[in-house]
Swiss-Prot record:
The EC number(s) this enzyme carries: 2.7.8.13
GO molecular function: metal ion binding; phospho-N-acetylmuramoyl-pentapeptide-transferase activity; UDP-N-acetylmuramoyl-L-alanyl-D-glutamyl-meso-2,6-diaminopimelyl-D-alanyl-D-alanine:undecaprenyl-phosphate transferase activity
Coiled-coil ranges (or none): none
Gene for this chain: mraY
Organism for this UniProt entry: Rhodopseudomonas palustris (strain BisB5)
Stored PROSITE patterns: MRAY_1 (PS01347), MRAY_2 (PS01348)
The protein's required cofactors: Mg(2+)
Protein name (Swiss-Prot/TrEMBL): Phospho-N-acetylmuramoyl-pentapeptide-transferase
Pathway(s) the chain acts in: Cell wall biogenesis; peptidoglycan biosynthesis
Classification via NCBIfam families: mraY
Higher taxonomy: Bacteria, Pseudomonadati, Pseudomonadota, Alphaproteobacteria, Hyphomicrobiales
Swiss-Prot/TrEMBL GO biological process terms: cell division; cell wall organization; peptidoglycan biosynthetic process; regulation of cell shape
Task performed by this protein: Catalyzes the initial step of the lipid cycle reactions in the biosynthesis of the cell wall peptidoglycan: transfers peptidoglycan precursor phospho-MurNAc-pentapeptide from UDP-MurNAc-pentapeptide onto the lipid carrier undecaprenyl phosphate, yielding undecaprenyl-pyrophosphoryl-MurNAc-pentapeptide, known as lipid I.
Length: 361
């Protein structure tokens, strides 16, 4: 909404600053953080009162969790999504379609996660919505978003897969790109969901990825920078940097309450939504493969589960002591802070590697 203050810049020159994406991104960071900082305690208290016993803990998971995490409320993603939405609505260009498409995916996935969390809390079981039902809904949301992105672009680029490290190598998938893009978004959502198993483990890598894709969106949406870096220019996507800024701010606010020992868990409400958001931004700015690098930690967590399940079904043996892989290291004797901080370091290194692909062409 504040973007419209540009109309007053002729009489009040100071309002001209709202033209700049960088300024509005900074404003979104501050707004998202302040909203969660100020409203967080009220949200946590209300969730604790309504949930009673809090999030049910898996009996087949690490036994220490039955003691250290018992009674902690979930659905903390509501805090993040609220701060993200407020920051976006206040600071983003309200007529930019990319903003609304990505926000729709984020909130849509958030609703699926919220209902899943609600089922778990009310039934006091770690099994919420059936996996098949959840995937069908996620693919419907992601497919609709990808269709909108292809239709919005109305060019061969919008339906193409861009290969990093090469200047002009693209694979035009046509309308099959809708299916590919949907897999990227759904995969990202569920990969982040699997990562969210320890206090602070998911939110910091999400913020690192959001900051990285905020920069990528800004560069890809700027014709001059895109030409200099020889990346594909996607008009209008620069505005997604504001959305990434809002997520970064809301994530910082949430981390204040999610730092060990956590006062609240983000739950599927947050993890599905944030993963879906990262996936949809990657699709919008044509950096789907780079997402697998920057979000490599999430890929590792997801692959560990796939390998574990496949190995057990085919051979009856487990590759890891427990999956996702962060539980494997718990079983090996690593402390929770050791796992979390080391995974954060990995996330930073992967983000730098992903950003390096912008120049290595």
């Amino acid at each position: 909404m504040l973007y419209w203050l540009i109309d007053l810049s002729s009489s009040i020159p100071a309002f001209n600053v709202f033209r700049y994406i960088t300024f509005r991104t900074g404003g979104a960071v501050v707004t998202g953080a302040l909203f969660v900082f100020l409203c967080g305690p009220w949200i946590i208290n209300n969730l604790r009162l309504r949930q009673g016993k809090g999030q049910p803990i898996r009996s087949d998971g690490p036994q220490s969790h039955l003691v250290t995490k018992k009674g902690t409320p979930t659905m903390g993603g509501l805090m993040i999504l609220s701060g993200l939405t407020v920051g976006t609505v206040l600071w983003a260009n309200p007529v930019n379609p990319y903003v609304w498409i990505v926000l729709a995916v984020t909130l849509g996935f958030g609703f699926v996660g919220f209902y899943d969390d609600y089922m778990k809390v009310t039934k006091q079981t770690h099994a919420g919505i059936s996996g098949r039902t959840r995937l069908l809904i996620e693919f419907a949301i992601a497919g609709a978003a990808c269709f909108a992105l292809v239709w919005l672009g109305r060019s061969s680029l919008s339906s193409s897969l861009v290969i990093p490290f090469f200047k002009e190598v693209v694979l035009n998938l046509g309308w099959y790109f809708v299916i590919f893009g949907a897999f990227v978004i759904v995969g990202a959502g569920n990969a982040v969901n699997l990562t969210d198993g320890l206090d602070g483990l998911a939110i910091v890598p999400v913020m690192i990825a959001a900051a990285s894709f905020g920069l990528i969106a800004y560069l890809a949406g700027n014709a001059v920078f895109a030409d200099y870096l020889q990346i594909n220019y996607v008009a209008g996507t620069g505005e997604l940097a504001v959305l990434c800024g809002a997520l970064l701010g809301a994530g910082l606010g949430f981390l204040w309450f999610n730092a060990p020992p956590a006062s609240i868990f983000m739950g599927d409400t947050g993890s599905l939504a944030l993963g879906g958001m990262l996936g949809s931004i990657a699709v919008a700015v044509k950096h789907e493969i780079v997402l697998a690098v920057i979000g490599g930690l999430f890929v590792l967590e997801a692959v560990s589960v796939i390998v574990q399940v496949a190995s057990f079904k085919l051979t009856g043996k487990r590759v890891f002591r427990m999956a996702p892989i962060h539980h494997h290291f718990e079983q090996k004797g690593w402390t929770e802070p050791q796992i979390v901080i080391r995974f954060w370091i990995i996330a930073v290194m992967l983000a730098l590697a992903g950003l390096a692909t912008l120049k290595l062409r």
